[in-house]
Amino acid sequence: MKTLIHIIPTLENGGAETVLTRLVEEFANNDIEQIVISIQGNANDFNHAQIARYCKVIIVKEDFYLVKKVFKAYTQATVLAWMYKGILKAHQWKSKFNTQQNIIWNIRRSSFRPKEVYQKTSLLFFGLFSKIARTPIIYCAYQAEKIHNRYGFHKGKSAVIQNRLAKKLQLNNVNISPIEGKYILYIGRYNHAKGPDRLVEIAQKLLPKNPLYSLVIAGSGWTNEMIPYNLKEQTVLLGNVKEIVPLYTHATALVFTSYTEGYPNVLVEAAVCGTPIVGFAAGDSPSILADYSLGNLVASKQDFCAQLQQLIDQPLAPKVRETAAKKALHHFDFKQTYQAYHDFIFP
């Protein structure tokens, strides 16, 4: 039996973790033995229980000895190292335990802000190391491949494998809105790279003019103190939400304010629900929305507000949204992603 070892920082509710969760299920259904090693996470992480249904999960900070045991027992396994921390640990443990696993890098980052000098400097190290180790590399986005090639990453064996629709969504029985009244939707944890400052500024311009609308925020890390006083009555903070389809389905629009991204899953999720999207270009958002008729990328906050106001003043007909959703559901089928991973890892 083929064995695949995943090494990832945590199993929290992020884009990479969502893709991992779905891949673990698909590989398990195709008789691939797997072990997931969570470097910093714990059993309460958002995706831990779901992943544990299909394979063994090792929490490093609970029992590091199990990591050694796995590396020694599965010397011929392939290691899929997720993100930079996973990459570092994979090579560190392979050297420490003197084993021969084949390591594949899974790079999720596609852009960096000007102030991220340390991160950019680190890329030079990773680029040099990738050439020395001649590691195979999977990029989650075309933008990620482009950026890393600038830093001299090994090109011998690499591929861009986009996430598509990684999360299993229940697209039926969404007739009842989970939110009272009309709303604009933002989905994402509180993180400076995801543009919370942009979101608040846009909301301050838009919501006072539209008192019947609210801003609904779903994602971890948001607190009431982060919302300006004049917006508190028109803002709803939900935290992490498991059943997100009703939120997408009944939203007037999804707003996407990120500065940097890899492959933003929220855009795909919104598309398969037929939700209009207004956003800035980040990561692979242009390629994701290229064939989605209800997606609008803008260059300024002024244009952002104008697009949202148009959707508020002239809401799209349900039939238009349903047609766009059906097309997107076919276009973003995760089976294509799984097959690409399988063929790359087990050629």
At which residue positions do the language-model features occur?
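A short, active-site helix/loop in glycosyltransferases that binds the activated sugar's phosphate group
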Residues: 133-158, 165
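Aromatic "clamp/platform" in nucleotide-sugar-dependent glycosyltransferases that forms part
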Residues: 240, 259
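Short His-centered aromatic/hydrophobic patch
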Residues: 81-87, 107
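Short hydrophobic beta-strand element within catalytic cores of glycosyltransferases
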Residues: 276-279
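N-terminal strand-loop element at the rim of the active site
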Residues: 6-62, 221-223
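Acidic anion/phosphate-binding donor-loop and adjacent secondary structure
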Residues: 149, 157-181
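Conserved acidic donor-binding segment of nucleotide-sugar-dependent glycosyltransferases
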Residues: 291-303, 310-315
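A conserved mid-protein helix/loop that constitutes part of the nucleotide-sugar donor-binding site
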Residues: 14-25, 182, 186-205, 217, ...
